[in-house]
Amino acid sequence: QALSYTIDVYQHKIKPTHDIVAFFAFISFFPQLVAGPIERATNLLPQFLVPRGFSYDKAVDGMRQILWGLFKKMVVADNCAAAVNLIFDEYQTLGGTHLFLGALFFTFQIYGDFSGYSDIAIGTARLFGVNLMRNFNFPYFSRDIAEFWRRWHISLTTWFRDYIYIPLGGSRCGKWKAMRNTLIIFLVSGFWHGANWTFICWGAFHALLFLPLFIMGKNRKNKDVVAQGRLFPDIKEVCQMFITFLLVVIGWIIFRAENIHQAWDYIMRMVTRFDFVLPAHGKDPLIYIAILLVVEWFQREKQFGLQIEEKGIFRYQAVRWTLYYVLFITTLLLAGQQEEFIYFQF
């Protein structure tokens, strides 16, 4: 974040600030300091240079986003984490269905964990009258890998785009150099997560999925919301989302594995030993995942899952507060064993 300020000043995108309080508030704003969103000086710093008053509507919206973030973290991510740890630790003794569930649970563990933190951070910032950039845009409803990366960890991917990809020449330096630049971005994205070959391979895996779309000029095809203005997607969209989701799940196996051998062994066992036998216990996360997907599907054109327009049935304050209390109590009752936020380690 401090680096973005230096670069933006150097590139004359923003003037150097002489307000030391505003500058230190920018680089140390606590809601998003640990795990994002990674803010730009052009967006966040000017908000500390002007007077801000308390906004009731903004605070209410912030509390809604905090509540939804807590649900994603405490109910979805933490309950998935217990099953994920068990399955990945004992994967060599389990059947393919168990292994697929382990991969599925980790897919939603990392989403609930990371996007939940982002929701909490963005909501907390709103209580202070500060607007942070959106970090997740319902990525598991993507129709191809390019769309997934426009919706996943938006603050980091756009940071890499603006400060690495474009300075390298972007896509205006010829197709081969543009492909090279794209590959570099994905490898840097993997290396950013840690000095483990699994992260590098995860980045390379996504690069291999992205580059064919880039070569065919289809990497910016799906920029709208899936099934926009419709209740359900069509068959083509369902197939696109399903295939994209499976590819993302495979990528998360590589990301979660301790080493490359384990990742390959896990995937091979999952495919060759698939037995269609559901485990007798540990299926509760499926219910929480289903709730998450249903809510976010119907809210996919909004900023976050609990963003409510005060009209229709929600124009009544009693209805809104009942919803808040039900979700809050449900989160407390169904919360899994407390787990540290995954992205605290990166």
Labelled PLM ranges:
Residues 2-345:
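Membrane-embedded transmembrane alpha-helical bundles that form the catalytic cores
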